[in-house]
């Protein structure tokens, strides 16, 4: 038996049709309809989309003015994209860059590139560098330069200014003060321990004395007074001011130094004897005697000779010999001024005789 409401040939049942229409009328028009039952075909997308369009149109026509129209998610997304595109067109491009153009510049942004070249650090010029060096650093610089370039020794010796006597003596006094300053306080000044402490400074002092004495000897130094003044100061420092150490090595060194000093005195005083011109002997003796008297050399040499155990006796003898020769020359000159008969030479009027006969008045007519 067949159930009630079933019909062959696909004729719809009236009851089902009415129920379906009732459901269609009672459903909300705002909700999209994708199908009535699970038995409806889902394979045809075109029929479902067309039914969706018809349903939407029928729903929009049947709605009242108080009802709102619902949109599908796809349409809403498209409209949102359209609004965003429209808003993007109206907005200015690159808001960050455009806003920076209206910002007031700060102190760093006001910097303008200068047309002058960039200032960079530079080393000091050579003359400024030399000016900034002290004495010790300048000496070291010159010595290192000579060691690196030995060929500069002759050039520097030629162009270097000659030291004055006072400059030379100041340097010697500085070397001598180094000896005195290194003497021990709680020990005998003349002991061996004291000598060993000052030995390096003593050697430096004697070396400096030797170098400067050679610089003030003839023929390099032609001024006798300058040479004798320097020798006097050096002799005074070595004989009278330097402690007399009991060390045997020091005694031998001091004795040798005094012998050399005495020889230097003789070399300076006798420099005029080597000229070889006998005509100028009297004049040369007069120059030496004048220097001896002005500098009071005999008195000074006597003091040096007493302390040095007659080391300067030969210098004293030479000075006395020059004084005697000068006295003889003066006496011989006075004797030569007197003639052999003891008569005084005739006056100038007696030596001149003129014949006035040619200039007499009688001879004027013949002229």
Curated annotation (Swiss-Prot):
Polar residues: bias regions: 63-75
Keyword set, alphabetical order: Cytoplasm, Nucleus, Protein transport, Transport
Biased composition, class Basic and acidic residues, residue ranges: 20-31
Residue ranges, annotated region (Disordered): 1-93
The UniProt record lists the keyword Transport: yes
One Gene Ontology term from the biological process aspect of the record: nuclear protein quality control by the ubiquitin-proteasome system
Family statement: Belongs to the cut8/STS1 family.
Gene Ontology molecular functions: proteasome binding
Self-association and partners: Binds the proteasome.
GO cellular component: cytoplasm; nuclear membrane
Annotated compartments: Cytoplasm; Nucleus
Organism encoding this protein: Candida tropicalis (strain ATCC MYA-3404 / T1) (Yeast)
Annotated InterPro entries: Cut8/Sts1_fam, Cut8/Sts1_sf
Name of the protein this chain belongs to: Tethering factor for nuclear proteasome STS1
Pfam families: Cut8
Tagged with keyword Protein transport: yes
Role noted for this protein: Involved in ubiquitin-mediated protein degradation. Regulatory factor in the ubiquitin/proteasome pathway that controls the turnover of proteasome substrates. Targets proteasomes to the nucleus and facilitates the degradation of nuclear proteins.
Bias type Low complexity, positions: 36-62
């Amino acid at each position: 038996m067949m159930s009630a409401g079933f019909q062959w040939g696909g004729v719809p049942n009236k009851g089902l049709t009415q129920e379906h229409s009732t459901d269609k009328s009672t459903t909300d028009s705002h909700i999209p309809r994708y199908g009535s039952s699970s038995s409806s075909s889902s394979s045809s997308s075109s029929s479902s989309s067309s039914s969706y369009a018809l349903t939407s149109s029928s729903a929009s026509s049947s709605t009242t003015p108080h009802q709102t129209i619902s949109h599908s998610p796809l349409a809403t997304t498209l409209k949102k994209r359209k609004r965003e595109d429209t808003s993007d067109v109206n907005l200015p491009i690159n808001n960050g860059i455009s806003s920076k153009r209206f910002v007031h510049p700060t102190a760093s942004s006001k910097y303008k590139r200068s047309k002058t070249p960039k200032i960079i650090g530079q080393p000091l010029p050579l003359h400024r560098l030399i000016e900034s060096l002290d004495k010790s650093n300048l000496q070291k610089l010159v010595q290192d330069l000579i060691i690196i370039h030995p060929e500069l020794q002759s050039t520097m010796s030629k162009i270097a200014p000659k030291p004055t006597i006072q400059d030379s003596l100041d340097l010697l006094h500085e070397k001598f003060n180094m000896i005195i300053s290194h003497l021990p306080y709680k020990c005998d000044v003349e002991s061996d321990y004291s000598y060993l402490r000052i030995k390096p400074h003593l050697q430096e002092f004697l070396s400096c004395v030797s170098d400067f004495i050679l610089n003030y000897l003839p023929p390099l130094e032609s001024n006798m007074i300058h040479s004798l003044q320097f020798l006097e100061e050096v002799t005074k420092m070595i004989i009278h001011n330097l402690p007399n150490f009991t060390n045997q090595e020091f005694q031998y060194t001091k004795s040798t130094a005094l012998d050399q000093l005495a020889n230097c005195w003789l070399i300076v005083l006798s420099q005029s004897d080597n000229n070889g011109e006998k005509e100028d002997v009297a004049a040369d003796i007069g120059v030496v005697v004048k220097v001896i008297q002005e500098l009071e050399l005999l008195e000074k040499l006597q003091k040096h000779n007493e302390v040095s155990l007659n080391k300067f006796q030969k210098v004293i003898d030479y000075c006395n010999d020059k004084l005697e020769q000068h006295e003889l020359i003066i006496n011989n000159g006075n004797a030569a001024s007197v003639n052999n008969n003891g008569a005084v030479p005739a006056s100038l009027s007696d030596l001149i005789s003129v014949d006035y006969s040619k200039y007499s008045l009688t001879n004027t007519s013949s002229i």
